[in-house]
Amino acid sequence: MAKTQAEINKRLDAYAKGTVDSPYRVKKATSYDPSFGVMEAGAIDADGYYHAQCQDLITDYVLWLTDNKVRTWGNAKDQIKQSYGTGFKIHENKPSTVPKKGWIAVFTSGSYEQWGHIGIVYDGGNTSTFTILEQNWNGYANKKPTKRVDNYYGLTHFIEIPVKAGTTVKKETAKKSASKTPAPKKKATLKVSKNHINYTMDKRGKKPEGMVIHNDAGRSSGQQYENSLANAGYARYANGIAHYYGSEGYVWEAIDAKNQIAWHTGDGTGANSGNFRFAGIEVCQSMSASDAQFLKNEQAVFQFTAEKFKEWGLTPNRKTVRLHMEFVPTACPHRSMVLHTGFNPVTQGRPSQAIMNKLKDYFIKQIKNYMDKGTSSSTVVKDGKTSSASTPATRPVTGSWKKNQYGTWYKPENATFVNGNQPIVTRIGSPFLNAPVGGNLPAGATIVYDEVCIQAGHIWIGYNAYNGNRVYCPVRTCQGVPPNQIPGVAWGVFK
């Protein structure tokens, strides 16, 4: 539904104040990529990559304008190549053009030719200047939307937005508040997006035998994974892709599990593999969410799994509800295991079958509750006892760091790393950039590691090579040291 001009004006003011109601608004100073500045509260980071870019603001704005029906793609210059839907019109910027408040300004020429730049018209001004609301004008991708007077240099197009005539937000609100008997609140429903990836996976030829519940070892929500992965291409998918990504109130269906396999268990695609036999769903934000938020993300996954089990005619049991660690050596699902069994596979190694069954039984109970009652509630293990999650546990997900005489911070961690699409130079004996070269870890290669280190501005993983050498491989950049370190974007996928 189109917005009124009053609603649009209110939205732009909220952007400028850093108070906009958006899931992509940064709530506190945040940094995950040392290539850019630390994002201040109020910045918009819609895809979880490269901090608060100019396009992030537009992605959020268009989602709001279209009631979450249209998600933009590409860089700023690509916005004039796509359709936002009914009511949106693309205009060339002519010498006589005076834009209206709320229009989208697109810069594609001159110094903006490579990537483009984009913002929102805050004040149409005149044919010489106008006021733009934008992000990343300074190149550091760290500020909330900021107003600036622009002289139209490089500005080639405007995108006119639909505006609804009629009552304003204030009148509508007053009308509702005058009602003596307000309508009861609707129960929140789970939104499922079927925006499938742009690659056709192999067909299974039958329904899946069950669901593997993963923890994503990442920081993105289901919507953010959709935004970053839907059109990522084969090179990224080869590093691992699940059928579903779930967070509070939202599940992204990346692949149709009823018809196609996914690459989520790391054990090949043979007829007996987890990839072939089972669907896979990621509980999102296992490395960033609070316990309370992560438990809400889990509930979305349980609710969705219950719906799929009904659709597929499956009963939740230990054969149909599976863990990633049952197929390959991995700590996944690490966060869920800590919360619901008290065992930390990252610091304590592989759990016993009894502990794995304890977690599976918890998952099974939650899924059954949704199938039978349509609802469920979380419980956690704290101090060895199961308790309600109304006061979430605060147990740390990672173990304690230690520092050696060389200034290297280190801790044990048993997991798997799948390299991205670029080779990485490894080092022998120590995690230093001037240590002897061990070779190149090829793109797409998988290694099982037992140690994590922070040294020389990088996070390293340590493992024993087949020839007996102790090898260290950098896997991302890192600012600072424990407990206040800020890791950069991972160069591959952790499982």
Swiss-Prot record:
Residues 205-334 form the N-acetylmuramoyl-L-alanine amidase domain. Changing E134A: Strongly reduced staphylolytic ability. One of its GO terms (biological process) is defense response to bacterium. Zn(2+) is required for amidase activity. Residues 378-393 have a biased composition (Polar residues). This is Endolysin LysK. The active site is at C54 (for endopeptidase activity), H117 (for endopeptidase activity), E134 (for endopeptidase activity). It catalyses: Hydrolyzes the link between N-acetylmuramoyl residues and L-amino acid residues in certain cell-wall glycopeptides. PROSITE patterns: CHAP (PS50911). Zn(2+) binds at H214, H324, C332. CDD domains: PGRP. Residues 378-398 are annotated as: Disordered. It comes from the Viruses. One of its GO terms (molecular function) is metal ion binding. SUPFAM superfamilies: Cysteine proteinases, N-acetylmuramoyl-L-alanine amidase-like.
